[in-house]
């Protein structure tokens, strides 16, 4: 199984890179994990609605090029479904049973995701109503993907 994480923006903070690197290493026992960082668009200080839509549209074009035609796509969005780690683990296991070989997660930039990406997604997922920096969300999501594999394995990692 392959797990892709498509992210808008470059990760700069060393502690986040180190954390993600650790979980990538751990995930290598269960799947081929790939994190794809895409360039984000610069947002003007006084951007209006139309400016923001144009920025998200440009970012969506970059994202769309990285999504495989047969990928099962989960986009992170505040309006997405929320569920406990056990259910997330079942979801990941179930995707492979349905015949998908690649699960692609998408984390948008600071403005979020364009509607075209949300429509392409097989599922919208949310980690709650809290606003988190999208760079931090990469680490949280990577840990949860690892946790999902550990739950499936029956490991005491998830207590």
UniProtKB/Swiss-Prot annotation:
Entry keyword set: Cytoplasm, Methyltransferase, rRNA processing, S-adenosyl-L-methionine, Transferase
Pfam family, one: SPOUT_MTase
Transferase is among the record's keywords: yes
CDD domains for this protein: RlmH-like
Catalytic activity of the protein: pseudouridine(1915) in 23S rRNA + S-adenosyl-L-methionine = N(3)-methylpseudouridine(1915) in 23S rRNA + S-adenosyl-L-homocysteine + H(+)
Residues that, per the record, bind S-adenosyl-L-methionine: 76, 108, 127-132
Superkingdom of source: Bacteria
Keyword ATP-binding recorded: no
Residues forming coiled coils: none
Subcellular location: Cytoplasm
Function recorded in the entry: Specifically methylates the pseudouridine at position 1915 (m3Psi1915) in 23S rRNA.
Summary of subunit composition and partner proteins: Homodimer.
Official protein name in the record: Ribosomal RNA large subunit methyltransferase H
Protein species of origin: Streptococcus pyogenes serotype M18 (strain MGAS8232)
């Amino acid at each position: 199984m392959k797990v892709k994480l498509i992210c808008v923006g470059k990760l700069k903070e060393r502690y986040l890179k180190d954390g993600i690197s650790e979980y990538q290493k751990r995930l290598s026992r269960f799947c081929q994990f790939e994190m794809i960082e895409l360039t984000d668009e610069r947002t003007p200080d006084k951007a209006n609605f139309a400016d923001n839509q144009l920025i998200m549209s440009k970012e969506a074009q970059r994202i769309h090029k990285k999504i495989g035609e047969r990928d099962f796509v989960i986009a992170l969005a505040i309006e997405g479904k929320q569920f406990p780690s056990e259910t997330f683990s079942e979801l990941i296991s179930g995707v492979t049973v349905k015949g998908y070989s690649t699960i692609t997660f998408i984390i948008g930039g600071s403005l979020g995701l364009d509607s075209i990406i949300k429509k392409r997604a097989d599922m919208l997922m949310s980690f709650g109503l809290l606003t988190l920096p999208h760079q931090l969300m990469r680490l949280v999501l990577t840990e949860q993907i690892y946790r999902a594999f550990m739950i499936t394995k029956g490991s005491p990692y998830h207590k």
